[in-house]
Structure formats: structure tokens, C-alpha cells
């Protein structure tokens, strides 16, 4: 019996890493909710209610600094400090506002993708189109309200895959995607999540050519997974697809091979720091509760004093028997856990974690600061390059559903590109002055000088376009 829920061995191997990164990036509440998974219980052999209560207090006092999540957000912010370049034909205009059918624009989809790459080193892009007849013109296309969509898939949701050699090319021949669909209850308010599996295949037709098919599996009445009707999508020209419009996206390359997440070492250190914090906060708790003691007394004195009230402090008389004494016992401070935590904090900063720490920049030389940025951006650059390539490929697949000949679309007419200029230079008055002087001399355009003054960045245009602007300004035809 076939089992659509079968998980690829590499998926099973990497799933714990992905789940750990999700928890750590989500923050303190998610980490603490997992209890002993990330914070082992002292005296775990003791199953008494008292020890359970002690562990809950130990867990509550622990402090989890959200370093990994902050680093991830910072790197995503660096990648999108400059707006991505997005070019598309009119048939794909909807992608600018709703790329996945759930309201996410292409920009937001790209941001989510970079975040997944940093956490999981992997995500999937899949393009589909409603099962309708291809429109013959743009007006008919808009009337149908059927648009190609680009779906971004979490690595956790792509549970199985396989590839084969076809015509001397390695192609994906199987992709199994776990999905959840919502169904509203009869009361109109309640909602249930129903699991299903979407299977993308390359399979031979009657002539031996491999074509793309889609089949959805749902749980039947007997609890077994039942495959629905197979669909064989076609492009705008009515031709079957000879490959699956799906790609894995990775931080090293876009192959199906899985690498370790780039934030995993930082997450492990973050959790180790969390455990040190728990021990340190435990010692702080006990240090803050000194124990009073009395010696040279008996129970009769204690009972009598208790009736009258025992008061300790300035201007208070406490009669003691002969040779009696009163004192305070306090636990010795445990500096070992604090020192271990501080060591790990420094290690996290050395690993390129972007901590929101005011004044930290003053403790670093320019070389050290640039080195930290280089470490982060070398990882981020790889993520961005591969995401750009995958998103541009997905755009071409989407275009193939609605345009007769996608080969005529060049990079100037169809592309998505996240900028790799992660460090904004910022506005420089001297540079603005030089641009103005160059414009006066006819070696640059006033348009470029104006845009730099407004944004602090050079306009993104080709040399030929700048030449046209200069000539237009000289002969008075510039559209300023």
C-alpha cells in the first residue's frame, strides 16, 4: 500500500533543526513553552509534586534573550533597505499586490523567503494556475479573474521529493506538499483545519514523454489517504508542462540537497546562554532571601517570643537568654553561572549577532565593525542571490500560463531582484556638490543630482540612460 505521508530521510534528519530554529526565533514564550526540551529539570529523577513546582519556578525565573530572532530580523531588514527591482508584463501586474492568492505581495513573499533561508537554509517556490481555459487576450484574462500564483512553501511542509534523469537532465519527478485547509463549522463561527497532501509528479504519457501532473490526497472515511482526480496543467498554448514548476531555494545553491541552517550555531549558543541564565537567576533568588537564626535559645523561649511578636530592626529590643545570639545566614554568590553566561554573550556578538545594544559600536574599531558586517553579509549575499534566481524563474513560469511566448521576455521585462547593497552609504554633502558640478559641466544629469539629494542613493539606471538624460537636458527636451 502506498503511503503519501512518507517522509524523505533527509527531511526526517533536518526537521528537529528547523523546529528548534522556529522556536528560538519566535522568542521566549515559545522556548519556555517547550519546558524540559530546552531547559533540563534539575533532579529529573525526582517525580514529586514539590520538585515539579520547583522546576516551574526555575523555568519562570530563567531569562531568554531573543538574540537569534533579532539577528534574523536585522539581516532581513538589511536585504530590503533598498527596494527590490520588479519588472513584469501587464498580465502579471497582480503579483505586485497579491502574489500567492492570500494577499502577500511579491515583495512580502521575498522577505518571507529570505527569513526562511536564514532559519532553515531552504524553502520551496511553486507556481500554479486555476483549471480554466487560457484567455485569448488581456481583457478576457481579466474577466476570468484567474491568475497564476506563486506559493512560498516552508521547508517543513515539503515532506518528500525525488528526481530522475530525463534527456540528460536531472529533473524533479516527485514533490509531496503537506497542506492544511480550513472548513467553517455549521454554526458559522468555529473552524477546523483539515490536512491534505498535494502531489506533483512527472509521469510518462502514452507516447513516453514525461508530463507534469497534480493530485490531491485527502483522508477517506476509513482513515486511509485517497488520491483525487489527476490534473495535467497546460500552458497558455495548451501544451503540457515537461517539468514541475517548482524549485527548492537554498542559501548555498538551489538544489534539493539540504545544508545546515546558518543561524543554527547562534541558536545553540542562545539556548546555552538561556540555561546559564536559569542557574544564575536561581542563585540570585536564593541570595536575595537571607535566613535569620537564633542560637542559645530553647523552644520555650521561642514559643513565648512568638506570642509577643518577634521584631528585628533598628530601635527594636529583642530580649535573648544568657549566651544567646541572633544572626543572618546568606548563600554565597554563584558567579560561575554569570561568568559562563557573559562568555556566551560575547561569543554571540562575535558570531555576528546584531544586538540592539546602544553604545556597542564605540567599543569596536572600524575594521572590526566592517568585519562583522562582512561575516553577516557573506551569508546574506548567498541567500539573496539564490532567492533572486528562484523568484525570477517563478515569474517566468507564471508568465508561461498567460503569455504565448515567454522567450521574448528579457531581463528588462521580467525579473525580480533584491538589492545586495546592504550598507546604505547615506547622504554626503561633498558627493552632492560633485554631482552638481558634473551636471553643470554636462558630464552628468541634473536628474541624477536631484534624485541623490532626495534619497541619498545613486539612481539605478544604465549608462546609456544617463547619456540620454544629459542630452535631453542640453537641448531642453528633458521631462523633469
Stretches with model-predicted labels:
Residues 100-119, 253-260, 264-267, 271, ...:
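Generic amphipathic alpha-helical segments used as scaffolds and interaction surfaces in large
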Residues 78, 82, 102-109, 116-124, ...:
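Short secondary-structure junctions and interdomain/linker hinges
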Residues 118-251:
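Extended, regular secondary-structure scaffolds
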Residues 226-367:
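Extended, charged amphipathic alpha-helical segments
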Residues 29, 36, 46-56, 334-337, ...:
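Hydrophobic alpha-helical segments and helix-packing faces
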Residues 317, 343-480:
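C-terminal helix-loop subdomains that flank or include functional centers
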Residues 17, 91, 110, 262-269, ...:
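Alpha-helical structural motif
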Residues 1-158, 478-480:
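Extended, helix-rich architectural segments
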